[in-house]
Amino acid sequence: MNSDDIFFYAAKIFGYFLRIDNLVFVAVAIAIALFWRKRTVLAKRLTIAIAITLFLFSNVGLSFSALRTLENQYPIPSIACDDGYEGVIVLGGGINPGLIAEERNQPQLNDAGDRTTKALELLNKCSNYKVLYSTFSGSLRPEGMSESDSARLFFQEQGIPESRTIFENESRNTFENAKFSAKFAEPGKKWILVTSASHMPRAMTTFKRFGWDVIAYPVDFRAESLGKYLSWSRGQGIENWNMFIHETLGSLMYLLRNSDA
């Protein structure tokens, strides 16, 4: 097991336990155990803390405010086909890999599918562009069709010739996206980097760290500009916070990691 493997597995494990919904589940289990052990005072305090946590993190407006600090860091650029870009780098996450894609032989776009459709839009707009689709699987136990192979099928179905497509089929995270994609790109070429807006700060930092000349093209925005501070949703609010925490801690971990890891 090399340093890339250690980093990948550690990030997956920490990421799982730092999700708010998982932390609340653990806290509820502890509260039940405390009640069962007759430690009612401590159990009641923990129950109140759980209720306050759910109340705050379920607030949609607060989650939007947090997420906008990531999504607003890079504006949507104006792209001209003669600006000297080699093409579009798409970071995986917009197509579901797995057994369904393999069994149905059909790419399964998900709620981050804007990454893939924006790349297609730019390819159709600029006939001189190529697409470099970078991903294998972020799963601990990948099975079925990889996302890269699903993306290959998607672009084939959309009529994009193979001469304009490049597929990096090893990476499991953003660090490896930047590291492994360098095998397919000529030094000094300019690229357009497409990924979700909340993911873009970490992606840009990582790609520039590996010497890439990229411009950010954020997609898949989740945070509205309207307040919605009187709106609560455990699904939307907590999931937005999970995304914010994941990206913020991910950026911190990448900063702490040696560039030659």
Language model features with spans:
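Hydrophobic membrane-insertion alpha-helices, especially the h-region
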Residues: 45-60
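Membrane-embedded alpha-helical segments of integral membrane proteins
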Residues: 1-36
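Extracytoplasmic/luminal low-complexity segments enriched in Pro/Gly and acidic/polar residues
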Residues: 220, 226-232, 241-261
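Membrane-interface helix-boundary motifs at transmembrane edges
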Residues: 35-44
